[in-house]
A protein has these predicted regions:
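N-terminal intrinsically disordered, cationic/polar leader segments
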Residues: 1-42, 48-49, 54-60, 67, ...
Length: 145
């Protein structure tokens, strides 16, 4: 994931490119959270149906996403927020292992709630970003992507 961020950072110059880069990062993180939450819902269904192999695949996928989110944190620049998220992601990873071993739907619900709350916070991020006009020669549709 850091490679993707590095690639985006090397794109363009100026305020609009910088804002687009931040928006792209936010969108990527939102997509990761969507995939994580989808995997958790899928795992719940597999647990309820007793489909152990499919449950395992869903929980492993969820765990990989959490580890990816954790690895994308910049602990130096992110300060307390990044450190707190790092600890939360470690906790969630341990809870996913527990769910996988014990088929515990209550613990799965706990993880879904925690990650759903974080996802909602990321949903609100675009509203906090400054609005800008596209750079000269950049079509409005391109500036929005």
């Amino acid at each position: 994931m850091r490679l993707h961020f590095k690639a985006m950072e090397s794109y363009g110059e100026g305020n609009n490119a910088s804002q687009a880069m931040v928006a792209d990062k936010v969108e990527l993180i939102q997509m990761l959270f969507d995939g994580l939450l989808d995997s958790l819902v899928t795992a719940r269904g597999h647990i309820q149906r007793g489909s152990i192999e499919d449950k395992n695949k869903s929980l492993v996928r969820a765990g990989r996403i959490v580890i990816g989110l954790q690895g994308a944190l910049d602990l130096e620049k992110g300060g307390d927020l990044a450190r707190n998220l790092h600890e939360l992601y470690s906790y969630v990873t341990r809870r996913l292992v527990y769910v996988n071993a014990h088929n515990d739907l209550a613990v799965l619900e706990e993880v879904q709630t925690l990650m759903g709350d974080i996802r909602q916070a990321w949903r609100d991020v675009p509203n906090l970003l400054p609005k800008s006009t596209p750079a000269p020669g950049v079509p409005m549709s391109a500036a929005m992507h």
